[in-house]
A protein has these predicted regions:
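Basic, alpha-helical nucleic-acid-binding regions used in initiation and control of genome expression
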Residues: 1-288
Length: 288
């Protein structure tokens, strides 16, 4: 479950239909405890995770400690579903987020509306944190594409519309489309959820998200249209990787401005290797 979903559920159980007013009440409670420490506590549900803080996340972490006591949860449980900054870098321009023991490239974090699985909302009553990350395009449990719009055309973002699955514009239940079914996308979603999916590598979850970041860098996208290519790449590993390196060398030799003798390895293979500095890992056992 995402941290946003948790707060929405707590708000609903305490009689708040709009989570914003619940957060306003929570902030008032926290300010009574320590005005200076909790002055920056957000009342926008989209900014509730510690990583959203512009300067530092200590005050939000302290706030989660207090809220865990109010909701009768262990602090470690509530902090375990929060997204925090992490010092690890997946590439020179890509920092990481950490949730529990799972490290995810920040580049995959969705910036717009968060799509959802209507079946999950109806069956489980909460939202998954995986919905917040590109690459996870299908629900691996219900084999349906995540949606961000109701059939009436209105955007459905659970952070504002809630967890009921009811469109705030037309009042109808949102439903998953069975059109354009992509079994390959579901296989990738299952793999990102921790399942063993051949031919994809059996590695820890953090590495799987790292591979999605790497693939998005070399293919400029990790959307549905590249799912077949992604699976084929691992099906023919390592020959597919050797072929990719060969293409990159040929292209950079042909279009280079400098003479070949002046080229650095970074100039030739930068997109493949330097854009993903965490791969391969120092731990040889984790290498593919």
């Amino acid at each position: 479950e995402s941290l946003e979903s948790f707060f929405i559920r707590v708000a609903n159980k305490n009689g708040y239909n709009d989570v914003h007013w619940f957060l306003v009440a929570v902030k008032r409670y926290l300010l009574d405890i320590d005005p200076r420490k909790f002055q920056t506590f957000p009342t926008d549900i989209c900014c509730i995770n510690p990583y959203s803080s512009k300067k530092h996340s200590i005050s939000r972490t302290h706030a989660l400690h207090h809220l865990s006591q109010l909701t009768f949860n262990e602090p470690v449980d509530l902090l375990g579903i929060a997204l925090n900054r992490n010092q690890m870098q997946f590439s020179p321009s890509t920092t990481a987020l950490i949730r529990g023991a799972e490290v995810i490239p920040r580049s995959l974090l969705r910036k717009g509306a968060i799509p959802c699985c209507p079946c999950c909302l109806g069956e489980h009553g909460y939202a998954s944190y995986r919905w917040h990350f590109s690459g996870y395009e299908y629900c691996h449990e219900h084999d349906v594409k995540l949606i961000e719009r109701c059939s009436c055309g209105a955007i459905y973002d659970y952070r504002y519309a809630g967890l009921s699955g009811v469109c705030t514009e037309c009042g109808e239940n949102i439903s998953a489309s069975q059109e354009n079914h992509e079994p390959k996308a579901t296989r990738i979603a299952s793999w990102l959820a921790g399942d063993d999916v051949k031919p994809l590598p059996d590695v820890p979850l953090s590495y799987r998200w790292g591979f999605m970041h790497w693939w998005s860098q070399i293919s400029s996208s990790c959307k549905t249209r590249n799912n077949g290519e992604f699976l084929a790449f691992w099906e023919h590993w390592p020959n597919s990787f050797h072929k990719l390196i060969g293409k990159e060398i040929d292209f950079n030799f042909e279009y280079c401005v400098l003479s070949k003798n002046d080229l650095r390895v970074k100039d030739i293979l930068g997109k493949i290797l330097f854009s993903s500095i965490q791969l391969p890992d120092r731990n040889f056992r984790s290498n593919i």
